[in-house]
A protein has these predicted regions:
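Contiguous, glycine/small-aliphatic-enriched amphipathic segments in soluble metabolic enzymes
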Residues: 1-98, 132-140
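Short, well-ordered coil/turn elements that cap or connect secondary structure elements
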Residues: 30-32, 106, 115
Length: 140
């Protein structure tokens, strides 16, 4: 059975839907997985993030978390959001990664960035570069 990867649309007033459409239509995604959109295209004011587009982005993140909990999807790819407007819509996490960790009740998680030739798992996220050295150790 193929793993199912969900894609959120991000902030639909910005580049989120374009990024997802480009990825899904590129022909470069592995055929060993199935891909599903989380949420639906909303009729929002385009051009700059706004409270309405942030509210929809937050709703789609909640839908993705529920789909993960229920086993409907196995992983999620999140499109870009504007954190400032997302926080204005009631999103209280530093980023989407921490949101999913809390919703899925896990302390063992990582943000990964994947490209054509390289996948990177980040050791730290959403902190200042100045703080990074004090947070790294060989035990973890």
């Amino acid at each position: 059975m193929k793993p199912v990867i969900g894609y959120t649309l991000g902030d639909q007033a910005g580049i989120g839907p374009e990024v997802v459409a480009a990825a899904l239509s590129s022909g470069e995604l592995p055929a060993e997985a199935e891909y599903r959109l989380i949420g639906r295209r909303e009729n929002v004011r385009m051009g700059r993030p706004n409270p309405e587009s942030a509210r929809h982005a937050f709703e789609h993140l909640e839908q993705a978390a529920q789909a993960l909990r229920e086993g409907v999807i196995d992983a999620v790819v999140t499109a870009p959001v504007c954190k400032e407007t997302l926080h204005g819509a009631g999103f209280r996490w530093p980023g989407q990664t921490e949101f999913f960790a809390e919703r899925l009740e896990t302390k063992n998680y990582a943000m990964c960035l994947t490209g054509k030739k390289l996948t990177v798992g980040l050791a730290t996220i959403h902190i200042s570069l100045q703080s990074v050295p004090s947070l790294l150790n060989t035990e973890e």
